[in-house]
């Protein structure tokens, strides 16, 4: 219908949602809930390994009144781990230009490779932000790299709970306790780098590193 306002692209709506979700009082801060790498993989629509070829600042929409900007990264996709049913080959990824909206800064025109997780919007564009799991490929452990192919995907029925204080106990048989913050005061510590929360035939879940059971200090954390 002539004169009718055009609907906003899905990425513009997502930008507005990120702005609304910004915690009050944090100013320019970007705040994300903690998540284990396995949770990131399970909750992401797209998981790829890629290099960044170039970057460009682009408008968030075709509306001249819209002042929001996006960073568009042109990438060279090396391998896709998840998202085959949504997109075949990713050429561009988009992120908010504003860091307060969780925009991601990546190194372009370098040899650095990244593990990128993100969402595929209704218009087919791939959108990433700081609350996604985005890591230099060289920083991933061997267990993490191998788990991208199978173990993370096959165990999305397990629940991972972050432990902040003791005692910290499971509330369901399919739950694993993530204790990196308690033991190392950082999220992506030894447990995140070397263990997968795996489901057994009886429906229970527990941490495993390949065929090795969980280290004793991870088990002891559930005791008062």
From Swiss-Prot:
Disulfide bonds join 30-102, 32-131, 42-156, 158-205, 163-168, 176-197. It is found in: Secreted. The record marks 69 as: Involved in metalloproteinase-binding. Residues 30-156 form the NTR domain. SMART domains: NTR (SM00206). Gene3D superfamilies: 2.40.50.120, Tissue inhibitor of metalloproteinase-1. Chain B, domain 1 (3.90.370.10). InterPro entries: Netrin_domain, TIMP, TIMP-like_OB-fold, TIMP_C, TIMP_CS. The keyword Cell cycle does not apply. It holds the Pfam family TIMP. Keywords: Disulfide bond, Metal-binding, Metalloenzyme inhibitor, Metalloprotease inhibitor, Protease inhibitor, Secreted, Signal, Zinc. Zn(2+) binds at residue 30. One of its GO terms (cellular component) is extracellular space. Complexes with metalloproteinases (such as collagenases) and irreversibly inactivates them by binding to their catalytic zinc cofactor. Known to act on MMP-1, MMP-2, MMP-3, MMP-7 and MMP-9. This is Metalloproteinase inhibitor 4. It comes from Homo sapiens (Human).
């Amino acid at each position: 219908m002539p004169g009718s306002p055009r609907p906003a692209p899905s990425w513009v709506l997502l930008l507005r949602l990120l702005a609304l979700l910004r915690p009050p009082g944090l100013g320019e801060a970007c705040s994300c809930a903690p998540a284990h790498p396995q949770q990131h993989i399970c909750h992401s629509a797209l998981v790829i390994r890629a290099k960044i070829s170039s970057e460009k600042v682009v408008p968030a929409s075709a509306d001249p009144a819209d002042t929001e900007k996006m960073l568009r990264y042109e990438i060279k996709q090396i391998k896709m781990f998840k998202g085959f049913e949504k997109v075949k080959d990713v050429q561009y990824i988009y992120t908010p230009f504003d860091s307060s909206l969780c925009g991601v800064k990546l190194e372009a025109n370098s040899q650095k490779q990244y593990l990128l997780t993100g969402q595929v919007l209704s218009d087919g564009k791939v959108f990433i932000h700081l609350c996604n799991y985005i890591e230099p490929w060289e920083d991933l452990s061997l267990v993490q790299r191998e788990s991208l192919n199978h173990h993370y995907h096959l165990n999305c029925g397990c629940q991972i709970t972050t432990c902040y204080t003791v005692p910290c106990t499971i509330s369901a048989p399919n739950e694993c306790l993530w204790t990196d913050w308690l033991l190392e005061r950082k999220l992506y510590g030894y447990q995140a780098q070397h263990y997968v929360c795996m489901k057994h035939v009886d429906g229970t879940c527990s941490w495993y590193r390949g065929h090795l059971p969980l280290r004793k200090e991870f088990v002891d954390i559930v005791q008062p």
